[in-house]
Swiss-Prot record:
Signal sequence residues: 1-27
Lipidation (N-palmitoyl cysteine): 28
Species for this entry: Helicobacter pylori (strain HPAG1)
PROSITE patterns membership: PROKAR_LIPOPROTEIN (PS51257)
Protein keywords: Cell membrane, Lipoprotein, Membrane, Palmitate, Signal
Name of the featured protein: UPF0323 lipoprotein HPAG1_0235
Amino acid sequence: MKKPYRKISDYAIVGGLSALVMVSIVGCKSNADDKPKEQSSLSQSVQKGAFVILEEQKDKSYKVVEEYPSSRTHIVVRDLQGNERVLSDEEIQKLIKEEEAKIDNGTSKLVQPNNGGGSNEGSGFGLGSAILGSAAGAILGSYIGNKLFNNPNYQQNAQRTYKSPQAYQRSQNSFSKSAPSASGMGTASKGQSGFFGSSRPTSSPAVSSGTRGFNA
């Protein structure tokens, strides 16, 4: 049975309905934008999840092309033809469990030197490792964070899960801006890269199927 694919509009470019969908996903259901308490609540909610877009590569691996804070965690997969779909909670948990087993036995490319190989075909990251290398991995896979936190190979490989240095930097900036300044835990450590090596939230919010995103 074929899984349904949905084209996800660029909310940053397309106005109207896309903007309304964005508002609903970050949990701002009120039209009273001038209330300080509501703004404070919104600021806190975006730290609970991440919206991540993974793009399939020619070698069938996956790269993070965009991610930013969201009230709930959404993972969108874009195939080579540009079709996009949102992974279900069950799919995500299955992928994380499979990758955890690889981490335990040392076969995960996240913990191998130089991404587990050179530039040969198939040396890229699969869906599970791409998820755990993203911001969503720090949230959904927080329970295995200790297995990765001090791993120097992970610290390097997590950056390689991004399609470009610019995509990685945009993510860092986006999550740093959304972090609470008073806690002293809002920005990633300059000495570490990757999301298990930063001060990302470690709560595990429910995964929700979203219907919007934007092209990198």
